[in-house]
Amino acid sequence: MGGSPKNKRIRTKQKGKASGVSRAGRRARAAVAAQPRPKMARISDEMKYLCAMLGEEVRTWPGVTSKAMFGMLGYYRSGAVFAALPVTRAIGSANGIIFKMKAMSEAQTDRASRDLRLGTGTNIKADRWHSFEIHSEDDLRDALWWLGQAYESAR
């Protein structure tokens, strides 16, 4: 009563194979997986210090938690990631932080177009992620502003 032999034959036939995926599709997926990952840049001691200062401020915001990820510290609001600050490594530039925004308002888009430190890094493969270059303490105010915008966007 455990099932007919026909059902067993079907289960055996499907075992180990992804249903509906062609051999070419499996080869293409394997080729993508075999590609080397882009190297993450090591950050300087100054950048470690600047990011630690930013991180201290961000952790004081309501509902913010942090979690280590890929040599960076990810910041979350109510379970949604909104930023990542380098601890030992950075994505793209060694001086860059990254943040995620759902959609920029017209005012944010205008401000972003005038700020050469802001961009969508070529090493960031996901939509809505932006990078911000920090070269000195003078850049922290603007970096904090963008992190605040990302925090609000993560509602």
PLM region spans:
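Polybasic, lysine-enriched low-complexity intrinsically disordered terminal tails
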Residues: M1-R42
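Charge-dense, low-complexity intrinsically disordered segments
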Residues: R37, A41-D45, I134-E137
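Terminal, positively biased "leader/anchor" segments
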Residues: K39-M40, T65, A83, F99, ...
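N-terminal first-folded block
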Residues: A41-V81
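Generic alpha-helical secondary structure signal
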Residues: D45-A52, E106-A107, D138-R141
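Short, intrinsically disordered, mixed-charge
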Residues: E56, R111-L118, W145-S153
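Short, conserved beta-strand/beta-arch hydrophobic-aromatic motifs that form part
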Residues: A68-D127
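Well-ordered alpha/beta subsegment
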Residues: N123-R155
